[in-house]
Amino acid sequence: MLGLKFLVLLSILWGRVFRLTNTQHSWTAPKDEDASLTPNHASASVSEILSLQVLSATQNPSTQGPAAAERSSEDDVLLQSTSQPSETSTPPEGRHQTPLEKTGTAVVSLPLSLQDKPSIKPSTGAGTVMLANATLKFLQSFSRKSDQQEVSTKSAGDMGNRSARETHLRRSDNSRNQRPSYQKPSFETTRGKNWCAHVHTKLSPTVILDTGSHLPSGRGSCGWYSSGLCSRRSQKTSNAVYRMQHKIVTSLEWRCCPGYIGPNCQLKVEEQQQLAHSNQAESHTAVDQGRAQQQKQDCGDPAMIQKLAEQLSQQERKLSLLQKKVDNASLVADDMRNAYLSLEGKVGEDNSRQFQSFLKALKSKSIEDLLKNIVKEQFKVFQDDMQETTAQIFKTVSSLSEDLESTRQAVLQVNQSFVSSTAQKDFAFMQENQPTWKDITDLKNSIMNIRQEMALTCEKPVKELEAKQAHLEGALRQEHSQIVLYHQSLNETLSKMQEAHIQLLSVLQVSGTENVATEESLNSNVTKYISVLQETASKQGLMLLQMLSDLHVQESKISNLTILLEMEKESARGECEEMLSKCRHDFKFQLKDTEENLHVLNQTLSEVIFPMDIKVDKMSEQLNDLTYDMEILQPLLEQRSSLQHQVIHKPKEATVTRRELQNLIGAINQLNVLTKELTKRHNLLRNEVQSRGEAFERRISEHALETEDGLNKTMTVINNAIDFVQDNYVLKETLSAMTYNPKVCECNQNMDNILTFVSEFQHLNDSIQTLVNNKEKYNFILQIAKALTAIPKDEKLNQLNFQNIYQLFNETTSQVNKCQQNMSHLEENMLSVTKTAKEFETRLQGIESKVTKTLIPYYISFKKGGILSNERDVDLQLKVLNTRFKALEAKSIHLSVSFSLLNKTVRELSMACRNASTGTCGQNALIPRWTKGSLPGSQSSQKSLTELVESIVEIKTQAALSNLTWNVDRLLSDTLANIVKPQKQIKLQKKPNTLKKTVNMTTILIGRTQRNTDTIIHPVAQEHSSCSSFPCQNGGTCISGRSNFICACRHPFMGDTCTVKIKEDDAVAPDFSKGSYRYAPMVAFFVSHTHGMTAPGPILFNDLSVNYGASYNPRTGKFRIPYLGVYIFKYTIESFSAHISGFFVVDGVDKLRFESENADNEIHCDRVLTGDALFELNYGQEVWLRLVKGTIPIKYPPVTTFSGYLLYRT
């Protein structure tokens, strides 16, 4: 008998605990207040609502006597939360009206439902016995519960039979009737062009109450003193099940457009002259600028608005956690209720009188208050923990957004610095006129600086990678420790269960001697309870096995990542070697051309300088001979008479001397011609060097422009990814799903990757800022960074590949240094050659002066007399000539040796230059991949952030649930020793039990106005699991979530898959008078065309400026429709052709045509075509522009553009 009492106590305590939990999660609101709520006040503080409901549930209605106090139990509180929230208004027609009972809290109490009163016929011979008043009250408390649920479902019958949309429309009609008559009930407004629409989108939580039915099997209960077999019966009971659902609600708010201020949105004084350029109404950029200008004019404080938004998001997360808890509580309540029904059947067979006093003791309010206090404390602790957790999460998110904003500002500064660097072109033109060797030295210095900067940049990422590895190891150890703690907690739970089982067995052994039938019933109940415990233990074991399997999966992923890193290392090394070989080949080809030029120069010098030296030596010898002869002839000049006589006799010798002088003059003239040719060739060589330098500078400037474009596009992609994360962060609907996600552990790694790339961009900004100060260095780096946009997106390089690349770069720089040294030697040789040329010129000038001085007296002497020579003078002249020829031979040998050294130096220089070119080409090809590898990490930031939030919420939820279960177990163990005591015996009067008629009904509480998106997710398995199978029918749009999907149906269809059509009486058109309409996501794109197009086909707009929704594909030039709705498109096309034509295409069908033709086809003219279109398009359709005839020129900034955006969804 004591075991029976214990089980009855246990079932009642569990039923009351979970009934109180369900009561706390109910959501009620007066009907009068629902009509006056604005969209901004729909998401009220859930903690305040829950506290009010708990307060109303715990009031003491003992002011009307014992009878009223007995009737106003916790079931009445549950009836208040589920019935229509209108206590003072008159019930509508068609609903069952119930009288009000006067209690202390004015609670609506419904009478018992006695429609079906089956009686149990006792066996013959049994006397008629009346039940006591206490027993009658006890049975009425159980029958009143089901009767109240029946009446509540009847009162909500009309709304249950109608759809969620109909209920919402009737509420909106009631609120619409209360508006003043001067308001206009339409979406149109009389506002002017100075007003702009601002869209606000948020998640609105809604509590859904459902009822579940249970049909127990087994024998029915018999009379109190019946004997023999009893008739078989079935009893159907219902219990409340609460669920939470999030609704996406978008509201429209009118504010002043950018440039307008004041309550009437008047134009500013400083912007009166710019009126023609400020007509954009609902542009995303204008809205962002308008927010900054309208912060002072808005009625609300921006800080308060931000604070309220954070509070709303916190409350939404709390509701999602409470939903899971309510579902679990409802399931446990079902099990305990089944146990209670089985006990109720057994009570009829017990003829003792101790049971009534035992039940009366159970209804004491001290236990009820104790349970309520414990639950309040647990919920308070849980609420504090959740507030702290969410505060930390939002703090982390805000810091991440600040870092991303600082990165964006830094990139903008880089762009500004690039614009300022264009002002240094005059300085660059002045440097082009300097000699080539200065440019080479500057290039050497720039390469040294680049090598130092690359070394500095490489050290920090390596250290960061080491820190990341240590962090990952610590996280793995922490996870192992958590698993160990989970095992310990599981063992403790099992030990507690074993102790409880031992206590139950002891109680059963003590009470086993009283009644055999009672022992069998208790054994069956105990076995059921033990089976339930075994099932829970098996579930926990399965969860543990799943955790272990997830751990193995993570370890396999880590091993796969290491293998991928090694493979990427090898592939990168092979690519680097190939690129270096290619660059070496190119540089060898260039040095070969340089060698040919130097060979031509050497040949020219050999052809000019060597003959010139020979001729100069001959002339010097002849001059020496002449001077010697003049000295000999000097005494003869004094004897003019005798010399004249001899000259007359020797005319032949004079003619020979004249011929020699003429030959000497011709040789001198030829020497002058050769000298002029040498100077001309020297000038040509210098001009060629200057032209090559100019071409080099031109190429560097072109590479600088292309590098700027690549950096701008890269930052555009990063900004789009950041905006995508920020826009979609609030739109997550499945934060309440507590399923285990094996990708949670990857969150830290992804976040670290994002942070490391932020630091790398900061280093990049610093290096670019230093490059701006040095023009040659800046141009060289821009030439290297040009290849950033040439690498395909599927190639990825990780941080470990940078070390190999830097080693190859260091080797290349060492080779370049050797090349520069050789070039410096070559420059010194060139200087020496120029010096010798100058010396030759001075010597030629001196010889010419000497010849002129010598010829003047020589011509005079020929006029006066002849020349006498003898054999001695001839011998002396021959000796002098021999010595001079020997000296010339020595000079020629010295020159040949110097030219051979010069050729050797030139060859070494060519080899070094080729090596340097191969190294630079390899770096040009490899550097762009470093930045390309960072794009997938930034695109996966959205998943990482959401998974981080879900992991933290799961941990906090598990901690709160474990604390709650521990307190309940402690309460049960404390009360176990105090309640099992002998009770007084009371007479039992016989009264037939009444069958409780239940009606399965679903009551939906709608919190806000919604258009065609109010869908109910039932626990029934759905046929479709994602949008890939196209589940939405009748033109509905499928919106994907994390674990399910939602169909946005078109009017007048509704349902999970848009298959239910609303009746004509209920199909009321949607009303947009209050500015609320269905969720409209941001979908917009703007692209331009900077390349030329000469062939017909789709126009591929290459420059992507805006792409919200990621629906435009630059590779195909097509815009894919993401949602069913009305879209607006605009296009502008420029052409120099005489005839241009094309089409606006939708899914391969030409919808619109644009054409322009000149009457005179031979005249070349510039024309611009513009057009716009508005279409209602469905999901999956594609839109593009197709050129049929004509060409599109290359122009930057571009003129040819194409844009579009989503106006509203249908």
UniProtKB/Swiss-Prot annotation:
Its main location: secreted. Disulfide bonds join 196-257, 222-230, 256-265, 1027-1038, 1032-1047, 1049-1058. Residues 303-338, 564-690, 809-846 form a coiled coil. Residues 192-267 form the EMI domain. Residues 143-155, 177-189 have a biased composition (Polar residues). Residues 57-102, 143-190, 276-299 are annotated as: Disordered. Keywords: Coiled coil, Disulfide bond, EGF-like domain, Glycoprotein, Secreted, Signal. Carrier protein for platelet (but not plasma) factor V/Va. Plays a role in the storage and stabilization of factor V in platelets. Upon release following platelet activation, may limit platelet and plasma factor Va-dependent thrombin generation. Ligand for integrin alpha-IIb/beta-3 and integrin alpha-V/beta-3 on activated platelets, and may function as an extracellular matrix or adhesive protein. This is Multimerin-1.
